[in-house]
From Swiss-Prot:
It comes from the Viruses. Residues 13-52 form a coiled coil. This is Probable tape measure protein. Keywords: Coiled coil, Viral release from host cell, Viral tail assembly. Serves as a base for tail tube protein polymerization and acts as a template for tail length determination. Belongs to the P2likevirus tape measure protein family. The lineage of its organism: Viruses, Duplodnaviria, Heunggongvirae, Uroviricota, Caudoviricetes. InterPro entries: Phage_tape_meas (IPR010090). GO terms for biological process: viral tail assembly.
Length: 944
């Protein structure tokens, strides 16, 4: 490698090291910036969470306070309204001592049941008492009247006051007793049902007609029927009552057109000579009278309206007569119905959601009223105390005793304000100058703070810069080698080589400058060219470094961003300090001074109230407490002799009474005791004899019953024993026969199936001998080996099943016993004794089990040894036929063949590799069977 290549390699390595170092500086700066940003973001998130919690707390607190305040205001308002209404009602009590607490409870109960405001019921109760409803101690009659009107108001789509005043006006107009309330309500409800009107409309207008109707003896039922007829035809309720009033007035007033027409129409009838009032008293319906007048008008070729002096009365007559007469009759009949139409309508109107919500709302208001009633007296006392205190304070101010103190406080506060203004006046210019200096020197302050920020960043980059220095030093050796090579070659150093020499300290700056100036002067022609080239080279170098070195580019970008961000934060902090912190502090200072007046005022009030309370307590102690003590002591000593005498007399009386009671008790009960003792001893011998006789009889009965039972049960036991032993041999024989038969059947089937299997195997082999002579031995060998493996493998399968069964038993026992972890109960109470118990049971049964197995195997062996006793199967028959056929074939082959090799070719044997047995004929099968039986016995004895 040439010296130039080595130098170039050193420079490249130096550049790579510098890039790596710059990347480390960039990474350190970026990590610091990320950490700063993360900290700022975490702080901002924490502040945001605190702001959310604070806002939520403010909202919740405001909601709670608002709800509580609204509830208190609502309760206070409802309670005050109810109190005012009931107080207003109490002015109607007169001399009657009404149980006001009971009355208030009844009103609240009615409000809760109907959903009508308690204050409205109280106001209506006042109107009811004003209209003449009687006042009693328990107010039972009045509250019954209120309850009925509350129901009518719901059923008639109006308020309770309208329903009540209408009812009261009708009762007063007709001079009815309050007991007629149901009758009036029924008529009003039927009028609403039959006409186009409501109880509310009737309540507002009935007073226009009821006085006239009552004066004319026109019943309220006829008023209702008339208004129902008229409103059903479209006449508004107010006009209908006006028209009906005009009709009644004209018919009843003497000398009117209607009165004369009535007298003319009744001539020659049973109503002749009677006035309208007399006809009404006689119970004649209005429509019948109007029909008579209509007939008279038609005779005179007039209309019914001509029979009246006013158009209003004529309209009413037309609505109640002629074709409308039948409807009037039906309406009049409906007014006297026996059905409780008010309660029915009330029940329907109360079963709506609006009604239920109203009841719930009034229940809450009534709860507030009850709370208010409990608190109103303490609140009254507190208000009176406050009024008294304010009055005393006003007197103190007016009398001059507090005037001087207030003046002194005002003067002191004025002096304090003046002092603050003076201090502020002196300090403000200095603060303004300081602010101006800060504003003027803002860039300098910012640069200082930026320097602090940059210094903190560069602290983490020092190590990277040290690494950069080491990279430059690392290139020194290569440069030296390069220079030696250049010296040996006798060449002149280039500008790049000179730069490398300077950077590695192998060439001084003066030497490099001299060499570069010489080269530049020679090439560019003077210092100006050199300057241009230098600037161009610097710019080109920076551009090349920016374009080719990502570490340098990132470092510059991050450094600039950090400087810009730090400057922004520092300058923002300075601006916030002078635009927010200082004004806020000034506002807080002003607020503190503005609140000082209130604080001094409250402090003075507290001091004054404390002195007033103390003085009142002292005065009360000497004017109330001590006189009360003295009075109580005097009363106590005054009552002492009487109480002592009373106590002695009471004790003496109790003693005498006790003595009399004891004597009376003894006189009464001692003879009874003696009589009972005498009677007891007189009856004792007879009772003993009766008991002995009864006992002896019961013992005899028991003995007889026991003997009889013993005879019966002894006979039954003996019979059962005889029967048992009589049937025992048969049962044993039956069991043995069944058992032996099952064993024999099993052995027979096994022998038969074994022979059949062997014969089928041999038959199959014989059938395939001609085509596969070489595979016969392998087939026989594999079949027998598979059979044997199946027999011996059954032991492992059986063992696995037994293990699974035992494991299932243990798991089920553990779950049923509640054991889910190693337990001392299972270890000490079950585990210790379980193997011993199994062994004891196994040891007690092993001899019988071995004997049973030996018997079974012996029987099976005997049956296998004597196959002639077994019924010959198809397989055996085919096997014998095959053997006979083979023997015959061998005989033919022996006869026809002249060579000895034919016997070897045709007598093909089956060699089964199992104890060296060769199967040729049936005897070989028996031999093979015996060997298999022996192996089975050995396998069973060894425990498969």
């Amino acid at each position: 490698m040439s010296a130039g290549s080595r130098a170039l390699e050193a420079v490249i390595r130096m550049r790579d090291e510098a890039s790596r170092t710059l990347r480390q500086v960039r990474d350190a700066t970026r990590a610091l910036q990320n950490q700063t940003n993360s900290t700022s973001q975490a702080q901002e998130r924490l502040q945001e969470q605190f702001r959310k919690v604070s806002n939520a707390a403010k909202i919740a607190g405001a909601g709670i306070v608002t709800g509580i305040g609204a509830g208190l205001v609502s309760a206070s308002k409802a309670g005050a309204e109810f109190e005012t209404a009931m107080t207003k009602t109490s002015t109607m009590f007169g001399d009657t001592k009404v149980d006001t607490e009971n009355l208030n409870n009844k009103v609240l109960e009615l409000s809760k049941n109907t959903g009508i405001a308690a204050s409205s019921i109280g106001e209506s109760l006042y109107n009811a008492l004003s209209s003449g409803i009687p006042v009693t101690k328990d107010m039972g009659s009045a509250m019954d009247f209120m309850t009925k009107n509350a129901k009518l108001s719901k059923a008639g789509f109006t308020d309770i006051d309208t329903a009540l005043t209408a009812t009261a006006k009708v009762l007063n107009a007709y001079k009815m007793d309050v007991s007629e309330t149901d009758r009036v309500h029924k008529v009003m409800m039927q009028t609403q049902n039959k006409g186009i009107t409501t109880v509310g409309e009737l309540g507002a207008t009935l007073a226009q007609v009821t006085p006239t109707a009552s004066a004319m003896s026109f019943s309220f039922e006829q008023v209702g029927a008339s208004l129902a007829n008229m409103t059903a035809q479209g006449t508004p309720t107010a006009q209908a009552t006006t028209q009906l009033n005009s009709l009644l007035a004209e018919l009843g007033k003497t000398g009117t057109v209607a009165n004369k027409s009535l007298l003319s129409a009744t001539k020659g009838t049973k109503y002749a000579g009677k006035s309208f009032k007399e006809l009404m008293q006689a119970g004649v319906p209005l429509n019948e009278i109007l029909n008579l007048m209509d007939g008279s008008a038609k005779k005179n070729k007039k209309s019914l309206i001509d029979m009246f002096g006013s158009i209003e009365a004529g309209k009413a007559a037309l609505a109640l007569s002629g074709q409308n007469s039948e409807q009037y009759t039906n309406n009049l009949k409906a007014m006297s119905t026996q059905a409780d139409v008010v309660s029915s309508a009330y029940a329907k109107m109360s079963n709506t959601l609006e009604s239920k919500v109203g009841i719930l709302k009034e229940s809450f208001k009534n709860l507030g009223i009850e709370i208010y009633s409990k608190l109103k007296e303490p609140l009254k006392n507190a208000a009176e105390t406050g009024i008294q205190c304010l009055s005393d304070l006003d007197k103190q101010f007016s009398s001059g005793s507090l005037k001087a103190g207030i003046s002194q406080i005002a003067q002191s506060f004025g002096d304090l304000t003046s002092t603050i203004i003076k201090v502020a006046t002196k300090a403000l210019p200095t603060m303004i100058k300081s602010l101006s200096w800060v504003l003027k020197n803002g860039p300098t302050i910012a640069s200082v703070l930026v320097s602090i920020k940059v210094a903190s960043i560069m602290t983490s980059a020092v190590k990277s810069i040290v690494a950069l220095k080491k990279a430059w030093i690392a290139a020194k050796l290569a440069v030296r080698v390069y220079m030696v090579g250049m010296a040996e070659a006798g060449t002149v150093l280039s500008g790049f080589q000179i730069l490398v020499g300077v950077l590695t300290k192998n060439m001084t700056i003066a030497q490099a400058r001299t060499m570069l100036l010489a080269k530049a002067s020679a090439l560019l022609g003077g210092p100006i060219g050199i300057a241009i080239v230098a600037i161009t080279a610097l710019v080109a170098g920076l551009v090349v470094l920016w374009n080719t070195n990502k570490g340098f580019r990132d470092f510059v970008i991050n450094a600039w961003n950090n400087i810009k961000e730090t400057t922004t934060k520092v300058w923002g902090g300075i601006c916030n300090f002078f635009t927010q912190t200082i004004p806020q502090a000034w506002n807080d200072l002003c607020t503190s001074f503005s609140n000082a007046v209130q604080w001094f005022g409250e402090m003075w009030n507290n001091i004054k109230q404390a002195f007033i309370n103390g003085w009142n307590a002292i005065v009360a102690f000497f004017t109330q407490t001590i006189p009360t003590w003295i009075n109580n002591i005097g009363v106590w000593f005054g009552q002492l002799p009487a109480k002592i005498g009373y106590g002695l007399g009471f004790a003496l009386g109790k003693i005498i009474s006790w003595g009399i009671s004891v004597w009376t008790y003894l006189v009464t009960n001692v003879p009874i005791w003696i009589n009972n003792v005498v009677t007891f001893f007189a009856q004792l011998p007879n009772k003993i004899w009766v008991w002995l006789v009864s006992t002896v009889q019961k013992i005899g009965q028991w003995g007889i019953a026991m003997l009889t039972s013993a005879q019966i049960y002894t006979s039954m036991i003996i019979n059962n024993i005889v029967t048992f032993f009589t049937t025992l041999p048969g049962r044993i024989w039956t069991w043995l026969t069944n058992t032996v038969q099952k064993v024999v059947t099993w052995g027979s089937q096994m022998a038969t199936k074994g022979k059949e299997g062997a014969k089928k195997l041999i038959n199959t082999v014989v059938d395939t001998l001609k085509s596969l002579p070489k595979k016969v031995m392998d087939i026989g060998k594999n079949i027998v080996k598979g059979l044997w493996n199946g027999i011996t493998g059954a032991g492992g399968w059986l063992k696995g099943k037994v293990n699974d069964f035992a494991k299932g038993v243990i798991d089920g026992f553990k779950n049923g016993f509640g054991v889910h972890s190693p337990s001392w109960k299972l270890r000490d109470l079950v585990g210790r004794f379980l193997p011993l118990g199994i062994w004891e049971r196994y040891k007690s049964r092993i001899a019988k089990f071995e004997e049973y197995i030996d018997n079974v195997v012996s029987n099976l062996t005997q049956r296998m040894y004597k196959p002639q006793e077994i019924e010959e199967s198809d397989y055996t028959r085919k096997y014998k036929e095959a053997i006979a056929q083979r023997t015959e074939q061998n005989t033919i082959n022996k006869t026809d063949s002249k060579t000895t090799n034919n016997k070897e070719d045709n007598n093909i044997t089956i060699n089964i590799n199992l104890g060296g047995v060769t199967v040729k004929e049936e005897a070989d099968i028996n031999k093979l069977t015996k060997m298999l039986v022996r192996e089975i016995k050995l396998g069973i004895a060894g425990g498969v």
